[in-house]
A protein has these predicted regions:
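N-terminal Rossmann-like dinucleotide-binding module
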Residues: 1-65
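Structural signature of beta-strand start/N-cap positions in the alpha/beta core
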Residues: 9, 46, 82-84, 108, ...
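Beta-loop-alpha module in the N-terminal Rossmann-like domain of NAD(P)-dependent dehydrogenases
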Residues: 16, 22, 65-128
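Short helix-capping segments at alpha-helix termini
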Residues: 31-33, 40-43, 105, 130-135, ...
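Short active-site oxyanion
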Residues: 45-49, 84-86, 196
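A contiguous active-site-proximal alpha/beta segment in oxidoreductase catalytic domains
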Residues: 116-179, 190
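Mid-domain beta-loop-alpha active-site segment that forms a flexible
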Residues: 140-147, 171, 175, 179-217
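Conserved small/polar residues in nucleotide/adenosyl-binding loops
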Residues: 218-225
């Protein structure tokens, strides 16, 4: 695929449920479910390349996106010149490795949440991003695009409710059926996710909580005087 003038070419690493969603979005493909509404892809974005180690995913990608280069090795994709930015939708333990390598090779990076499993790996990733201001780096928290949460943040930020002194975030609608965990072999495994709900669903809620109410200033095991 030749470079499209004025467009950011995205390379997708990992073509599972989430990677497939990105591919459909970047190509303005029809929604996968009847009645589902999908936002149109911005005019300055394009699907540049696809990458996965699964032969079945390779077959599917070549059938659905015959004009898009496919790679089995993400390092080969980064070096190919077919992409300007990458999006990682891979097992959590790989997030920092791929992101750091890509930034060090001049690539813009959008990493799916969570940032990682081990705090030391995440700190390395953050340090790399700071060391390479010439590239853009971000963690994808898609719930921030939800208009409900955007409105809540707007109300809180306006001061309409006064100063937030204490907050409690309760979510009881984020259960997942077994079909969700069967989408990919690495889901709900220590080797793939690195934890349970605190690594899978909870990052969305923790992010929304601090995004809307502000970052935690202190912790205390008992009430302050």
């Amino acid at each position: 695929m030749e470079k499209t003038e004025g467009k950011i070419r995205y390379g997708l690493i990992g073509i599972g449920a989430q990677g497939g969603s990105y591919a459909r979005f970047l190509t303005n493909a029809p929604a996968p479910f009847p009645g589902m509404v999908c936002a149109p892809c911005p005019d300055n974005c394009a699907l540049g390349a696809l990458c996965d180690i699964d032969p079945e995913k390779e077959k599917m990608c070549k059938e659905q996106y015959p004009d898009v280069p496919f790679f089995k090795d993400w390092k080969d994709m980064i070096a190919s010149g077919t992409v300007d930015a990458i999006i990682t939708t891979v097992p959590h333990y790989l997030h920092h490795e791929i992101s750091i390598y890509a930034m060090e090779h001049g690539m813009n990076v959008l990493c799916e949440k969570p940032a990682g499993v081990r705090s030391k790996d995440v700190q390395k990733m953050i340090a790399c991003a700071k060391a390479h201001p010439e590239v853009s780096f971000g963690i994808m928290f898609n719930q921030r695009t939800n208009k409900l949460y955007q409105k809540i943040k707007e109300i809180v930020a306006s001061g309409e409710l006064g100063e937030i002194r204490r907050s409690q975030w309760m979510i009881n609608s984020w259960w997942r059926p077994d079909s969700y965990y069967q989408q990919s072999a690495w889901r709900a495994t220590w080797g793939g996710e690195g934890g349970g709900v605190l690594v899978n669903q909870a990052p969305h809620q923790l992010d929304l909580w601090q995004w809307i109410c502000g970052c935690l200033l202190y912790t205390s095991p008992s009430p302050r005087d």
